Amino acid sequence: MATEILVNDGGAPARIMNLGNANAALEAGLGVDINSSGKIIAAADDQTGGTSKAQAAALGVLLVDAASGAPTSVITGKGIVCNVQSVAGLTVGEELVVDDAGKLEHSANIETDRIFAICLASTFSGTDSGGAATNFTKVLII
């Protein structure tokens, strides 16, 4: 992957941990969760107020690509600056939630959504490990 995921933890209580093996191949920069089998998955629950999973929290951000069944490196904690996979067109200062594919997106309702990060820079284009074009955004995990 050409894009650095962890920008600066700034001395924040960040941890890079192996919280389990990947359930399927996962790309660096995705918000991740853990399933009932203890496998790491892309955060698949849209964390907006209109869903039953609005209060669910993503575990963190995947630091490096993980092959199916392989150990994962997950950045956990708050106050960490990361480049994460996202939708296009995010605005600096915007509060972001994890969508149903592990990418960050706009918060439609900050009163009920589970805010995961704050956008620090405009969305930029990059490539994933497979060479596909992907959007990234520099964020502060909160």
Q: Which residues does each predicted region cover?
A:
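Glycine-anchored, exposed beta-strand/edge motif detector
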Residues: A2-I142
